[in-house]
Every structure is written in structure tokens, then in C-alpha cells.
């Protein structure tokens, strides 16, 4: 029921991946 939290988690994962690549 927390779609915002879900999206935030996805963004966090994406950011972590980008940081890893960088």
C-alpha cells in the first residue's frame, strides 16, 4: 500500500547501481 516507498526503493537501487558503475 506504499507505492511511494516502493518507487523510492527502486530509485535507491538505481542510484546504488549507478554509483557502482561510476
Curated annotation (Swiss-Prot):
> Where does this protein reside within or beyond the cell?
Secreted
UniProt's post-translational modification comment states: Contains 8 disulfide bonds.
Q: Which UniProt keywords apply?
A: Disulfide bond, Secreted, Toxin
Tell me the superkingdom of the source.
Eukaryota
One GO MF term on file is: toxin activity
| Protein name (Swiss-Prot/TrEMBL) | Cysteine-rich venom protein collettin-a
Q: Where is the composition biased (Basic and acidic residues)?
A: 1-15
Q: Which GO terms describe its cellular component?
A: extracellular region
Tissue-wise expression: Expressed by the venom gland.
**Segments for region (Disordered):** 1-22
Kindly indicate whether the keyword Ribosomal protein belongs to this entry.
no
User: What protein family is recorded?
Assistant: Belongs to the CRISP family.
